[in-house]
A protein has these predicted regions:
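Extended, low-hydrophobicity, polar/charged segments
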Residues: 1-186
């Protein structure tokens, strides 16, 4: 996979697709500084490992989930290497059964395609239908890595800026959850 070895500060000088540009516009308007790495499509956590080394932070796992009836949707942010077990999360949020939302739902709610899901997509959730869940282990990290709504760039943003500036600006209050590192924990 091609990765530009340069780490850039701020938005790119060249033109990008509109949804990526909107991410940079939002971050700039909030005074949130970030570093950026450009690369080929990186749509799995495994593909992001070399990018993480350049950014100096972990790119979090972003899971877009729905209930069985497809009447509620959640965006879960968690450490990339942490295993995910739906049963444990379902119990914490009081939902009978969770599954991965469809690509159509990702587009409908976040204007994002699979492999590009990120907390920045919440800026496109104008009706505030998506409930944000954040694993508590992320809140202790200095910075969080994420895509700017497209998986050909990755950003490093201070966790405090995400929690204190970005989420309030997008009017999304997170619910913090505790997911175990060990699959056997309940």
């Amino acid at each position: 996979m091609w990765i530009d070895p340069n780490v850039y500060t701020g938005r790119p000088a060249d033109k990008r697709i509109p949804k990526e540009e909107r991410c940079y516009d939002l971050l700039d308007s909030l005074g949130i500084s970030f570093t950026r790495v450009d690369h080929e499509h990186a749509d799995t956590i495994e593909a992001c490992q070399e990018i993480e080394k350049l950014l100096g932070c972990e790119i979090c796992k972003n899971l877009f989930l729905t209930n069985r009836q497809m009447t509620e949707v959640w965006l879960l942010l968690m450490p990339g290497e942490k295993p995910f077990k739906t049963k444990l999360l379902s119990k914490q949020i009081g939902s009978a059964r969770l599954s991965f939302a469809s690509p159509e739902q990702m587009l409908q709610y976040l204007d994002i395609t699979p492999g590009s899901v990120s907390v920045l997509g919440l800026m496109n959730d104008k009706e505030k239908k998506v409930r944000l869940l954040i694993d508590r282990d992320l809140s202790g990290q200095e910075a969080i890595g994420m895509h700017p709504c497209i998986n050909t760039s990755s950003l490093r943003i201070r966790t405090a800026d995400v929690l204190e500036k970005l989420l309030p600006a997008m009017a999304h209050e997170p619910t913090f959850v505790g997911l175990p590192w060990n699959q056997d924990e309940t």
